[in-house]
Amino acid sequence: MSRLQFQLQATDGHARRGRLTFPRGTVETPAFMPVGTYGSVKGILPEQIRALGAEIILGNTFHLYLRPGLEVIGDHGGLHGFARWDGPILTDSGGFQVFSLAHRRKITEQGVTFSSPTDGARVFLGPEESMKIQKVLDSDIVMIFDECTPYPATEDVARRSMELSLRWAQRSRDAHDGLGNDAALFGIVQGGVHPDLRSRSLDGLQGIGFDGYAIGGLAVGEPEHERNAMLEHLHPRLPAERPRYLMGVGRPEDLVEGVARGVDMFDCVMPTRNARNGHYFTSFGTVRIRNAKYERDLDTIEPGCGCHACSSGYTRAYLRHLDRCNEMLAPMLGTLHNLCYYEKLMADMRAAIASGTFVEFRRSFYAARGATTPPLPGETS
């Protein structure tokens, strides 16, 4: 039995305020999880991540299995000791990374055989292998092994993919339990943009029984309105007493719209990857620091921001200079800023839900960007 506890503390519309409790710590929800693909959130230290307000991070099963390998991580007692992060960690199953190797993999009932992107060797990964890897990683939330349905996909392709994922979900559950792993195990709802397939996937997963439910296959190129429609379809069907995780999404607007539709957890490489490309998130939009208009701009990225980059007075002109010179300080400062922005956004949403003012918060969020607040179901624009 999992040692994860989830407490739903407040709701405002469909938005949910809650708390995840693990032996390694608590996570206030809705939460954003910084991505540490190789056991490190690129460019910053674990203690800096914690200081920004992050309480849980994500590790990548697929990449850590290939490099450095389970023996090295096992020597450290698991991923926490290896990465020097003492809070909860969620590990994905490797399914999405296998999905991204479209031309180098073969899917069968047993699992997936693919060419390693590191050395070209043939590697097999299935539900049992994924559960064994995540047991060695000793993550606090384990994800089932699934097939990520591509977009676009015909209903027949999406159905066959969803049914395969359900069979793999049962095998993941059996393997996880057989290993005596008391980490939380999350199911992943698939089915593309077909509501009936999403319902069937969720029904099947609930029949197996999981500690939380992720919504997969919604960061693969589908239009925003189709993603939101799937979240709206699933919200009343997902068990209220279990956490909900929207995988791989995304922009600040996506987080706000996901929370408005009942999502509790998010992850995305966007704040860190975009920082390395000179894109800095702010309450008024994105500062693209490579734009010539910032060459002599003496403002910080966002005046009043409490991140190290802004509170220390580093100007946009200076950051543009660092970026143009390929100085490593530029992505470090940008990453600190972007993650600070994301974590503050989540904290502000938690406070708004708790106080019953999420509608006003959402309206203010878009107004600061000079944008019209998109209507929710049942509202008129």
From Swiss-Prot:
Binding locations of Zn(2+): 305, 307, 310, 337
The organism's place on the tree of life at top rank: Bacteria
Species this protein is from: Xanthomonas euvesicatoria pv. vesicatoria (strain 85-10)
Keyword set, alphabetical order: Glycosyltransferase, Metal-binding, Queuosine biosynthesis, Transferase, tRNA processing, Zinc
Reactions listed under catalytic activity: 7-aminomethyl-7-carbaguanine + guanosine(34) in tRNA = 7-aminomethyl-7-carbaguanosine(34) in tRNA + guanine
GO BP term (any one): queuosine biosynthetic process
NCBIfam families per record: Q_tRNA_tgt, tgt_general
Cofactor(s) of this protein: Zn(2+)
HAMAP family (UniProt xref): Q_tRNA_Tgt (MF_00168)
Pathway membership: tRNA modification; tRNA-queuosine biosynthesis
Protein residues bound to substrate: 92-96, 146, 190, 217
GO (cellular component) term, any one: cytosol
TM region positions: none
Name by which UniProt lists this protein: Queuine tRNA-ribosyltransferase
Subunit and interaction comment: Homodimer. Within each dimer, one monomer is responsible for RNA recognition and catalysis, while the other monomer binds to the replacement base PreQ1.
Cofactor note: Binds 1 zinc ion per subunit.
Phylogenetic classification of the source organism: Bacteria, Pseudomonadati, Pseudomonadota, Gammaproteobacteria, Lysobacterales
EC numbers: 2.4.2.29
Role noted for this protein: Catalyzes the base-exchange of a guanine (G) residue with the queuine precursor 7-aminomethyl-7-deazaguanine (PreQ1) at position 34 (anticodon wobble position) in tRNAs with GU(N) anticodons (tRNA-Asp, -Asn, -His and -Tyr). Catalysis occurs through a double-displacement mechanism. The nucleophile active site attacks the C1' of nucleotide 34 to detach the guanine base from the RNA, forming a covalent enzyme-RNA intermediate. The proton acceptor active site deprotonates the incoming PreQ1, allowing a nucleophilic attack on the C1' of the ribose to form the product.
Family under the similarity heading: Belongs to the queuine tRNA-ribosyltransferase family.
Stored Pfam families: TGT
Region (RNA binding): 248-254, 272-276
